[in-house]
Amino acid sequence: MPELPEVETVVRSLAPLVGRRIATAEFRNLRILRGGDPDLMSARLAGRKILSIKRYGKFIVAVIEGGGHLMIHLGMTGKLLLGGPSGKHTHAVLTFDRGTLLFDDSRQFGCIEYSEEFPKRVARLGPEPMEISFEDFAADLKRRKTRIKSLLLNQTFIRGVGNIYADEALFRAGIHPQALTSRIRIERARKLYDAIGEVLTEAIEAGGSSISDYVDAEGRSGFFQFSHRVYQRTGEPCLNCKTPIRRVIVTQRSSHFCPHCQKR
């Protein structure tokens, strides 16, 4: 699933659409729509300009002329593509005076929602991990009673971090994914806070991680996958100590870690 760095990269590649007017909007698959009639959505979008496109965690929100909001979540395999031919997995097409924007999703876990108000699903998210202060981060971490990997995946704690970057940040901070939040002292919390910011920044600079079929809106792959230190490296030697990387299940998700470098 595209996480914060991948979605941020997509949003940046969509910048040419800001200020452009939507000529037509076609929604071909009701499964990806959330609470909206396709004909009504098309009518509300046609003829209106896109005023801004921003990322909120893993969500994309385009503000539409007249006060509307178009929310998009890429799910597992969703793609937003500028131009190119429409295919069997193309579920929505926005046509502009010049060019098109396609929403492709082979597994159909992504979604599109139009609303006049700011999307409630987005409003319920926690703060951006690179905007929250350390004091607020540490205070909320202390209040939670769970395993640290589970907390990092909880989008009400901080938004946008998923399996890849939780594993990578925990490794850099030297914290075991099954460590209890109640046992993480302030010094280790600081290391984790810094590690989250560092790994997300580096991943954005690299265009994200293209592990399966992720590309940005221009069709470009990311290359941060070549910098992963633990994610999907089960059995390979730790880059710090040569101990084989291990995999455990936390909150029904695979977690990759070094048993020597990461402590509970």
From Swiss-Prot:
Protein name: Formamidopyrimidine-DNA glycosylase
Enzyme Commission number: 3.2.2.23, 4.2.99.18
NCBIfam families registered for this protein in UniProt: fpg, PRK01103.1, PRK14810.1
Catalytic reaction(s) noted: Hydrolysis of DNA containing ring-opened 7-methylguanine residues, releasing 2,6-diamino-4-hydroxy-5-(N-methyl)formamidopyrimidine; 2'-deoxyribonucleotide-(2'-deoxyribose 5'-phosphate)-2'-deoxyribonucleotide-DNA = a 3'-end 2'-deoxyribonucleotide-(2,3-dehydro-2,3-deoxyribose 5'-phosphate)-DNA + a 5'-end 5'-phospho-2'-deoxyribonucleoside-DNA + H(+)
Pfam families, per the entry: Fapy_DNA_glyco, H2TH, zf-FPG_IleRS
Cofactor(s) the protein requires to work: Zn(2+)
Function: Involved in base excision repair of DNA damaged by oxidation or by mutagenic agents. Acts as a DNA glycosylase that recognizes and removes damaged bases. Has a preference for oxidized purines, such as 7,8-dihydro-8-oxoguanine (8-oxoG). Has AP (apurinic/apyrimidinic) lyase activity and introduces nicks in the DNA strand. Cleaves the DNA backbone by beta-delta elimination to generate a single-strand break at the site of the removed base with both 3'- and 5'-phosphates.
Lineage of the species this protein comes from: Bacteria, Pseudomonadati, Acidobacteriota, Terriglobia, Bryobacterales
